[in-house]
């Protein structure tokens, strides 16, 4: 399926028009994770685009999970590499969150045990 969805006007110079704007790689991520990936107000997005030689577009999805759809444009290799990189960063964020929750649970149990001993 050859779909072009680009609405951005500031297409980076490394993206070839129109061939790189067809068939974007797409994945969904929670808005909280997106802030981790791209920084506050997307401050790191242009840097990540430049490093990955790809272009990103974001689309809010009406969902209770506050999902954002990320469209990745560029050459086939750059799209796949950028998607892998972003998904890996998102997975790392989730693992760090889980570790934090586990540490918090352990601390809570320790506090509860300490209160029982007193």
Swiss-Prot record:
Cytoplasm as UniProt keyword: yes
Gene3D superfamilies per UniProt: K Homology domain, type 1
Regulation: induction: Down-regulated by retinoic acid in embryonic carcinoma (EC) cells and in developing germ cells.
Gene disruption: observed consequences: Mice develop normally and are fertile. ES cells derived from these mice demonstrate normal morphology, proliferation and differentiation.
A single GO BP: regulation of gene expression
KH domain boundaries: 24-86
GO molecular function: mRNA binding
CDD domains given in the database record: FILIA_N_like (cd12795)
Keywords annotated in UniProt: Cytoplasm, Developmental protein, RNA-binding
Superkingdom of source: Eukaryota
Localization in the cell: Cytoplasm
Protein task: Involved in the maintenance of embryonic stem (ES) cell pluripotency. Dispensable for self-renewal of pluripotent ES cells and establishment of germ cells. Associates with specific target mRNAs.
Family: Belongs to the KHDC1 family.
The protein's name: Developmental pluripotency-associated protein 5A
Naturally occurring in which organism (per UniProt): Mus musculus (Mouse)
Organism lineage string: Eukaryota, Metazoa, Chordata, Craniata, Vertebrata
Gene: Dppa5a
């Amino acid at each position: 399926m050859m779909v072009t969805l680009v609405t951005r006007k500031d297409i980076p110079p490394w993206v070839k028009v129109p061939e790189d704007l067809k068939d974007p790689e797409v994945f969904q991520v929670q808005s909280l994770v997106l802030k981790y990936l791209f920084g506050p107000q997307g401050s790191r997005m242009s840097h990540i685009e430049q490093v990955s030689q790809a272009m990103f577009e974001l689309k809010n999805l009406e969902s209770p999970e506050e999902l954002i759809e990320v469209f990745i444009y560029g050459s086939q290799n750059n799209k796949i590499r950028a998607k892998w990189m972003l998904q890996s960063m998102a997975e790392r964020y989730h693992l760090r969150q889980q570790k934090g929750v586990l540490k918090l649970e352990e601390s809570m149990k320790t506090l509860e045990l300490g209160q029982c001993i007193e």
